[in-house]
Amino acid sequence: MSLVGCHILSIDHFSRQDLEELLMTAKLLEPVAQRKVRCNVLDGSVMANLFFEASTRTRMSFHTAFARLGGSVVDTTGFTFSSISKGESLSDTARVIAGYADVIVMRHPDQGSVAEFASKINVPVINAGDGIGEHPSQALLDYYTINNEFERLKKNIDGMTIAMVGDLKNGRTIHSLAKLLSLFDNIHFRFIAPETLRAPAELLELLRSRGHDVQEFDDIANGLPGTDIIYATRIQRERIKDGELMEGYSEKFRINAAAVARYATPETIIMHPLPRDSRAGAFDLSTDLDNHPQLAIFRQADNGVTVRMAIFAMVLNVHRGIESFFSPHRGFRPDRYGQGDADFYQLK
């Protein structure tokens, strides 16, 4: 389907053809993200960034993406700083903000709330995370990252094996990425989590119904060997209600240098949507992997700007012929940053 003027609420909206078009658009925009050229295709357009839940990367990434295309951004963060704290309904907020902006990016702690907001207006709304629901733009940048890493390694997404580790129950990035990968052929999914944090049964059923191999494990020793991708995610402590337990989540689920050396291959890519929890007892992706050549988490985060530029360009129908809006970049530019960190790791 065409993304022009559409809400982006779920990966369910995408076909494999849509992914290919997004990939091509993002490739065109890489020089803009890398500050090699400038682009003003959205000069005069306004994006409203509505974040009712904590965010660093996603909020700033969307803001940067729109600004690098020449657009302007208006922001609000948290309920405290919005009229919702005064009793305004989500419906009223939607109608008012739609009068200000050409596109709206929204994050909300309640599943389904972004879709409810979008149903009230005709301005395109992009879901930046709705509780334990979905995070479609994260899945799209994860796909873009996997594609880039596999191009380097001369691998195909079709037939790959991915291990998803951590809080699979509450981690919306897992839900969206698994749905996206199910559009490909013969994917081998390995879900690694304790009983209390297992992936939703309906997600596993969907993947199996599309002909994919789905296995569940309760430790990394059995789940990691032979994987092409390790996708770790933190425990969503903010979504675990009082009285609920993380029973069984321990060091045996932690992805660290020792585990990677023992169970992974030299070509296994290590991913994480970030933030990772560095506190004691969190058992999140270890910092002892920070200099590992196959650690892609920062390339992954950098790709967010590129992919979100592509989303804006396609939704606002400026993606075709966008190169005509490129102009030379002016000012200081670092020798290496963003996607260029592959040079630092001496990756070819």
Curated annotation (Swiss-Prot):
Enzyme Commission designation: 2.1.3.2
Pathway(s) of this molecule: Pyrimidine metabolism; UMP biosynthesis via de novo pathway; (S)-dihydroorotate from bicarbonate: step 2/3
Reaction catalyzed: carbamoyl phosphate + L-aspartate = N-carbamoyl-L-aspartate + phosphate + H(+)
GO BP term, pick one: 'de novo' UMP biosynthetic process
Residues where L-aspartate binds: 86, 172, 234
Source domain of life: Bacteria
This protein's GO CC annotations: cytosol
Keywords, alphabetical: Pyrimidine biosynthesis, Transferase
InterPro entries assigned: Asp/Orn_carbamoyltranf_P-bd (IPR006132), Asp/Orn_carbamoylTrfase (IPR006130), Asp/Orn_carbamoylTrfase_sf (IPR036901), Asp_carbamoyltransf (IPR002082), Asp_carbamoyltransf_Asp/Orn-bd (IPR006131)
Residues holding carbamoyl phosphate: 57-58, 107, 135, 138, 274-275
GO molecular function term, any single one: amino acid binding
Function summary: Catalyzes the condensation of carbamoyl phosphate and aspartate to form carbamoyl aspartate and inorganic phosphate, the committed step in the de novo pyrimidine nucleotide biosynthesis pathway.
The family this protein is said to belong to: Belongs to the aspartate/ornithine carbamoyltransferase superfamily. ATCase family.
Record's subunit section: Heterododecamer (2C3:3R2) of six catalytic PyrB chains organized as two trimers (C3), and six regulatory PyrI chains organized as three dimers (R2).
Protein name: Aspartate carbamoyltransferase catalytic subunit
